[in-house]
A protein has these predicted regions:
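Outer-membrane beta-barrel transmembrane domain signature
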Residues: 79-89, 101, 151
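C-terminal beta-signal and adjacent terminal beta-strands/loops
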Residues: 44, 53-67, 96-151
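Residues embedded in well-ordered secondary-structure elements
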Residues: 26, 38, 81-83, 99, ...
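Gram-negative outer-membrane beta-barrel transporters
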Residues: 1-66, 119
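Extracellular loop and loop/strand-boundary signature of outer-membrane beta-barrel proteins
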Residues: 15-24, 77-82, 130-135
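Charged, glycine/proline-rich intrinsically disordered loops and linkers
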Residues: 67-75
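Residues that define the transmembrane beta-barrel architecture of outer-membrane proteins
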Residues: 29-33, 86-90, 104, 139-143
Length: 151
């Protein structure tokens, strides 16, 4: 599926006293898409591929005052609205079914989520960080394995 949109305020939105007002809505990419594909090369083996594309979007980054910068790990900076990079999050899963008796299936599966390590690179750190400055996929590349029993 694909979503193409353009989200704007009727009047510019003043989100911070020191930052310019914005007509673009925050955290709403103009382009978003996803897909899933499943391939079964032999009856007990299934391979699934899934992906999500999130286009660039406008996000708010709060100011850090000189006083707060002196107490934490982040440098002083003004409030600013930034365009994020776009992200493509791809995952793969392989599953193999072992049949026991007539109605019992034991499945082994494994896979990788976020294969390309599409992940925010500029997190704020420390006690005075902007905890709302988060965008993009929620987890870095991860590996998983599982067992499923159906009866």
């Amino acid at each position: 599926g694909v979503t193409l949109q353009r989200s704007r305020y009727d009047e510019p939105y003043q989100w911070d006293d020191d930052a310019p007002a914005e007509k673009k809505m925050f955290r709403t990419p103009n382009t978003y898409g996803y897909f899933t594909a499943t391939y079964t090369p032999i009856k007990p083996l299934t391979i699934a591929l899934s992906g999500t594309y999130t286009g660039s979007m406008l996000v708010q980054r709060a100011a850090i005052s000189a006083e707060n910068a002196a107490m934490g790990e982040m440098p002083e900076r003004p409030a600013v609205a930034l365009m994020t990079p776009d992200f493509f999050d791809l995952g793969i899963k392989a599953a193999y079914d072992f049949k026991f008796c007539k109605s019992t299936v034991f499945q082994l599966n494994a896979g990788i989520q976020n294969i390309f390590q599409a992940y925010q690179k500029d997190f704020d750190r420390g006690a005075n960080r902007d905890s709302n400055y988060i965008y993009g996929p929620a987890t870095p590349r991860s590996f998983f394995a599982g067992v499923k029993i159906s009866y």
